[in-house]
Amino acid sequence: MNTFKFIVISSLLALLCCILTSCNNICGNKLLKQITTSDNKYTAIAFIRDAGATTAFSPQVSLFKVGHNLTDSDTGNIFIGNNSDFIDIEWKNENTLIIKHKCPKEEIHKKETKLKNINIEYIKLDDNN
């Protein structure tokens, strides 16, 4: 009887471990562009977040202090859109970031105009650009 209990408990623990390890974050980020301010303080990162077959691509932009590397757990702290795989960024000057996107207004979930001492401007492109 003790052998049977051991086998059952061991099997249940193995199954639980398999379930827990398969519940990893299924989202991934694809880096599109990374640009640094001329004073080398901040890095703007444009990326596409993909959370699997049942979700749309999400163009996102984050601003970090120089030295941060994009991870799959990062989400946009400046801009988050939906249903597009296009996003572009450029520095207008040391304190102004320009974000170009193709997201319709109703598909924009985050759109900051200032973060830290960085002003953020947006250019909405149509699908033909």
Task: Identify the role of each PLM range.
Residues 18, 48-49, 84-87:
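Intrinsically disordered, low-complexity boundary segments flanking structured domains
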Residues 22-24, 81-129:
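Acidic, small-residue rich beta-repeat scaffolds with periodic aromatic anchors
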